[in-house]
Amino acid sequence: ADISAVDFNTVGTYTAVISVKDGSGNETREEVSVVVQDPSASLNSGSTVTVGTDFGSYSSEYVPFGFGSEVDENNRPTGLQWYINRYGKYTADFIQPESNYIYLTMDEGYEYGLTEGILDTLKEKNVKAVFFITLPYAKQNPELVQRMIDEGHVVGNHSVTHPSAGLSTLSVEQQINEVKEVNDYVLEHFGYQMYLFRFPTGAFSEQSLAIVQSQGYRSVFWSFAYKDWVVDEQPDVASSLANALNKVHGGAIYLLHAESTTNASMLADFIDGCRAKGFEFGYYSKVD
């Protein structure tokens, strides 16, 4: 067989030539396709991750995240389908399947004294959320992180430094470290294995998604967000609540920032309003 054209270090489809001689010495040659894939391993969740990956084979092109205002008949943003079609294979969620469940996620970069009250509200309303934390947050707020875990919330990985230009602007080694250092710290100090990752700013690349997947993580984006992260420019509570309720949809992934006084103020009414519309809050489990 002639396999000289096959590069076993690079993912792709190649052509090899196989030759066979019969008893009379007649030779038959045939071209066959050889597919080189990333080695993979199955997680307990049932998902598959790449291992020993040559991340250079993935596109590092910067991909911003945004999906516009168009919605379908069920109020679900139609702009998300573009991302699902292209990147969903990297165990990435942009929205959950249509159902009466919605998923509440909160990003924690810095603590502004609001998380304790948010946790109180969630406990009172019997809602489990996902809190995406950075490494500095975990180090500076161990009591809050422990409470999140103790009260049954999911603690997700939001990178070490929250690079403002996006994770994909870093080197492969730096990106791996941004995920791994948070993972290892939380596991060591809290005995908690994280399994969800949120990209800082939402920007990513195909390569970044593959890197996060290779670390055993599911990437979680969102189907609702609004400008709530500027601490000194908080939006009006009433209009923000109306906006959040008007855009509710089955399978929604809500992104709220925990440093927002508006979010802290409207959270209880938001939960009640969603339930009044027939929705319930789901738990973001490891199962795909």
Predicted segments — roles?
Residues 4-8, 197-202:
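A glycine-rich, coil/turn loop motif that links secondary-structure elements
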Residues 35-43:
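Extracellular interdomain linker/stem segments of modular secreted and single-pass surface proteins
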Residues 114-117, 163-190, 203-250, 262-269:
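Alpha-helical scaffold elements lining the catalytic groove of polysaccharide deacetylases
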Residues 56, 62-167, 175-188, 192-194, ...:
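Active-site beta->alpha N-cap acidic-glycine motif
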